[in-house]
Amino acid sequence: MAAKYIFVTGGVVSSIGKGISVASIGRILKSRGLSVSVIKLDPYLNVDPGTMSPYQHGEVFVTVDGGETDLDLGHYERFIDVDLTRSSNLTAGEVYLDIIAKERRGDFLGGTIQAVPHVTNVIKQRIVKLGEETNVDVVVVEVGGTVGDIEGLPFLEAIRQIRNDVGRDNVFYIHLTLLPYLSAAKELKTKPTQHSVKELRAMGIQPDAILCRSDFDVPYAIREKISSFCDVPTKAVIPLTTVENVYEVPLILEDAGLGDIIMDALHLTGQPRDMSEWANMVTRMKELRDSVTIALVGKYVEYPDSYLSVREALRHAGLLHDRSVEIQWIHSEDVEKYGPDAMLSTANGIVVPGGFGPRGVEGMVETARYAREHRIPYLGLCLGLQVMVVEWARNILGLKDANSSEIDPDTPHPVIHIMEEQGSVTSMGGTMRLGSYPCRPVENTLAMAVYNERDVSERHRHRFELNNAYREVLENSGLIMSGLSPDGLLVETGEIKDHPYMLGVQFHPEFQSRPNRPHPLFGGFIAAAKLTLREGEQPPLPL
């Protein structure tokens, strides 16, 4: 059976939760026994977000096949519990690059290249191809940006055409909009929603359902008014009130009847609705009484979405151990300025996530030293492993000028250096070591104790690695190479001997954590960190 398509657009303002809404719709459909895939359409002209600043875009989410994608794909994977590929993110830059390459080759035989049909055809082909290749029941499509954006027009035209291409019974349009509250009038205003839907209809798209984002309860009379002006049944005008826990959103939408509306409109048959497992998880989150404090020491903490998957992975692990996780967002430059004692003394555990460039790295090195000397649980991700190695080389081996060649190209002791295959790379976009690669934890190590598997696969995004020229001397001094590539040439994980939990990894385990299945590295980290609630200097965890 051919896939059905659900398109989610946004109106009035951006950043009102389309990604969470799409992920929630996917969760609802999966709970009814349907298979689901998702694609995010981004109208910006970057080919992918891989070279975009975290301050503008947030984190870059890496897929199993090495795609550098929008952070919303992380929401999709966590909510729906699927592994997506680079095919689940399409940007305008990628579309235009494809078309221009074809034109230069002469594929269009001298024809005039236009937004319609050439741009729209590429967009449609990518959407339909995803449904065909994944062989799913439903493809949910998020259209980035806001209705009315100039760069989004070809994408809206493409999703309009798809309804005619695949049949009206196979497409469902959802419009997510904001209901602003005027405190002076003490009421929610519907006019922006009316105008947004009017503009959408002018493009030939009539929404089948409207999700109304609001910080306040939405009265039934407001829903009736929107229904009347926007030609949508009142039952399909669904309030979506702001909640503290985004994992509640699937339950809210299901209770509001969105699942039944979609199933009926698309003539889908599945299992009876059953969100009990998800509801139990959300209830457990609400009932957490004890907490654990984790210091996240990074370069981009002013914009926490830069570490969105790390934050969620910590949250998942906290739930596993019946702890809410309170994150202290600490800028690594502040550690340089004020010292680790002032910045880290109240933390039960420390995470140093990934990053690029020299800014703030010395603060991360000092953070690793503090965690080692004070026996505070430490989890280093990508750059977090590298600064752990640099700190050890400087303070244990006495190589005072040891560094990464990324940070100091002239260091006499490059304990971290560029990978051999990266040495000749000149282009920045899409050229790192990307995607899932195998790792083999070493017997009788913390890594093996945590994973309890001989072979694992983790997602990578890096150019630099531990320098094997220093590997023997590092290991002989107590820095254990506890996870290796299958050929034994690449150090994937390192850990400090006789420390409760000081583990660094060259990959990004946060991308594979799920609320119902926390990543073992984060689970082990929180298990160690929560012991500091009862004890000062904790004993080593048994292997």
State what each model feature region is.
Residues 1-326, 333-349, 356-357, 364-370, ...:
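Flexible phosphate-sensing "switch/lid" loops adjacent to ATP/NTP-binding sites
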Residues 56-64, 243-248, 352, 373-379, ...:
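Short beta-alpha connecting loops at secondary-structure transitions
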Residues 109-120, 300, 354-358, 432, ...:
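Short acidic-aromatic active-site loops that bind/stabilize oxyanions
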Residues 16-19, 23-27, 31, 342-439, ...:
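Cysteine-nucleophile active-site neighborhood
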